[in-house]
UniProtKB/Swiss-Prot annotation:
The keyword Metal-binding does not apply. It comes from Rhipicephalus microplus (Cattle tick). It comes from the Eukaryota. This is Kunitz-type serine protease inhibitor 3. It is found in: Secreted. Keywords: Protease inhibitor, Secreted, Serine protease inhibitor. The lineage of its organism: Eukaryota, Metazoa, Ecdysozoa, Arthropoda, Chelicerata. Residues 1-27 form the BPTI/Kunitz inhibitor domain. GO terms for cellular component: extracellular region. GO terms for molecular function: serine-type endopeptidase inhibitor activity. Inhibits bovine trypsin and human neutrophil elastase.
Length: 27
């Protein structure tokens, strides 16, 4: 998902990272 990649590229993927991980785990 582009959104996920965008979050990872951010300088502070703390909250984003959590969301991505949760999404991945859920999937």
């Amino acid at each position: 998902e582009v959104h996920n990649f965008a979050c990872l590229g951010k300088p502070d993927p703390g909250g984003c990272a959590h969301y991505i991980y949760r999404r991945y785990y859920y999937v």
